[in-house]
Amino acid sequence: MHSYDYLLLLAFFAIVLLPAPWLGRFYYKVMEGQRTWLSPILGPVERGCYRLSGVNADQEQNWKQYTLALLAFNLAGFLLLFAVLLLQGSLPLNPQHLPGQEWSLAFNTAVSFMTNTNWQSYSGEASVSYLTQMIGLTVQNFVSAATGLAVLVALSRGIARRSAGTLGNFWVDLTRATLYGLLPLCLVLALLLVWQGVPQTFADYVHAVTLQGTDQTIPLGPAASQIAIKQLGTNGGGFFGVNSAHPFENPTAWSNLFEVASIILIPVALVFTFGHYVKDLRQSRAIIACMLALFLIGGSTALWSEHQPNPALESAQVRQSAPLEGKESRFGTTGSVLWTVTTTSASNGSVNAMHDSLNPLTGMVAMVNMMLGEVIFGGVGAGLYGMLLFVLIAVFLAGLMIGRTPEYLGKKLQAREVQLLVATLLVMPVGVLILGAIAASLPGPAGAVSNPGAHGFSQLLYAYTSGTANNGSAFAGFGANTTFHNVMIGLAMLIGRFGYILPVLALAGSLAAKKSAPQGLNSFPTHGPLFTTLLLLTILLVGGLTFLPTLALGPIAEHLSLGF
């Protein structure tokens, strides 16, 4: 590693961590309807939205009403996007006259963007019109992220409130998350990207003749606005086929820094938002410490692995300081690895290098980040409510070890809460192991892999892990655009999204109804290094140990077979 690499890492952590406490407090004030510096500008817009939609902002909902509103909104978003994708060829703003998508691909794409996964079995510039990108994909990028933030806020209220029957109003939370939480930051990032050379235009594709005399089509489009929310909303779906490796999505080292930092900017800030809800920022610091520890463990492993020369190329007497196959030279190895670890720590899934070309252990780090349930920062809202589930599981385990009824911040965890927690632990195994096993056992679907042996298994394992974790990245050698995989990965994405959201909202309702006992000397502290260590081990053992046999068949076997 060179001095530039260390400066990149320093700048990345500075951009992410320094504004997090301020931004976290801002989100708390916004979601609770308190006045902020944006209120004079966006307040009238917010109130206008309520009047137009007939929403009573003062009427709160219980957890069942909140859940039904969320499900209805997401179903409507899915149906609208599904229709737009099917009818794309007949709609305006389609200068390339691209046809509508085949039904299974349209189903997969609509589910993908509705669940904040952004798994793409297609290439954007060759399959999706400008109108579809804007009113279909970009809109879902906003509202899927806002949905995750709303669920987190509902859980935070459930933990913080005492003897309460309501969690807030989903429509209000959705509106505030979009207007105040996402739009202003996206505007700033989009302008920065345009400054760096990312296109934002409705012009037709450019047809050019190269110096060699061959014809070339250069795709354009309203890219900067979508890329901004793709990153800040932890969505990840690329405007162009190769995502942020494309020079029009990510043209410079500066744009690379802005984009990779923006992936986890909001998730980190929301940890402090939770601290404001429970009136104890020590809880935020403990959770941040655990997240950073997991991130640094995975990042260090990936950096070490990816800077090792590939034995296969060494035997061919190819000189290499670090493997650059599948990477962009303008980002280098460290910039590519940083993005890989960040995008899989969050439920983002965008890439600036080809994950299929990573050394086996680097690819394994990316998979493990997702297999843990995207709790290392995670998606907007989704990452923290996933982490809070592990916090409650760690508290439950601590209670078992010391023989006390487990409690978190004065709320006792009883049979109903533990049942809901256990239900969430089944989400990743069902999506990855069961659906993945079905795909691997059938000769047709298994033929989607492009490599034999361990790496081919890793391609399939990565696909179903990414879908269930609502990440969206892929080993690009996997041929996902088949009816079987479009439907099965679509189901995995639905399981991964709503398999968490439904128990989380039920848990929030259960906790909100409980009385809160004052914490005394006998209470187990959840803000110190002891609990942080317990939480870290709980995540690794309870969340990760399930997948060790499959990892042994994939990236670990490949690593050993290559002779690293």
UniProtKB/Swiss-Prot annotation:
Pfam families, A to Z: KdpA
HAMAP family in alphabetical order: KdpA (MF_00275)
Segments traversing the membrane: 4-24, 67-87, 135-155, 179-199, 258-278, 286-306, 382-402, 420-440, 487-507, 534-554
PANTHER family, sorted: POTASSIUM-TRANSPORTING ATPASE A CHAIN, POTASSIUM-TRANSPORTING ATPASE POTASSIUM-BINDING SUBUNIT
Protein known as: Potassium-transporting ATPase potassium-binding subunit
Stored InterPro entries: KdpA
Any one Gene Ontology molecular-function term assigned to this protein's record: potassium ion binding
